[in-house]
A protein has these predicted regions:
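PLP-dependent class I/II
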Residues: 1-144
């Protein structure tokens, strides 16, 4: 199977999926296990956003998927990513949800809590909230 290159989807990987996810009850069971892992992480993100960033941005509360979309005030996304990196938190690049990563407002960030362990999500969100707060206050002071 693996010695020939093909154009198109990976047929061997598709076969693995078909054998693993045999029927719809198996798919639903597997997705429920994903929910049990992901739901607390997304709840953590939402809690930090609600408690720390009211009036400083907008965000989605997805019922599926792997990202929370956060819109800071215009002109702050790259600054927030830089500040978080300086504090040791790696965020998805600013504007990643836009074609070629070009967000004309420099406002959008995608938060991706699905991969790290819960404790890291919690710590990273504390840093993220602090960076958004600091960047927002600095911008307001510069514009005053």
């Amino acid at each position: 199977y693996l010695d020939a290159m093909t154009i198109g989807p990976d047929k061997v990987n598709q076969l693995r999926h078909v054998k693993f996810l045999k029927d719809m009850p198996t798919v639903f069971d597997h997705m429920q296990r994903h929910r049990e892992i992901l739901a607390p992480k997304f709840a953590c993100v939402h809690s930090h956003l609600e408690q720390g960033l009211q009036g400083m941005g907008r965000w989605t509360q997805p019922e599926g998927g792997y990202f929370v979309s956060f819109d800071a005030r215009p002109g702050l996304a790259r600054t927030i990513v830089r500040m978080a990196a300086e504090a040791g938190v790696k965020l998805t690049p600013a504007g990643a949800a836009f074609p070629y990563g070009n967000d004309p407002e420099d406002a959008n960030l995608r938060l991706a809590p699905s991969y790290p362990p819960f404790e890291e999500v919690d710590r990273a969100m504390r840093v993220f909230v602090t960076c958004v707060q600091l960047a927002t206050v600095r911008q307001a002071l510069e514009q005053a």
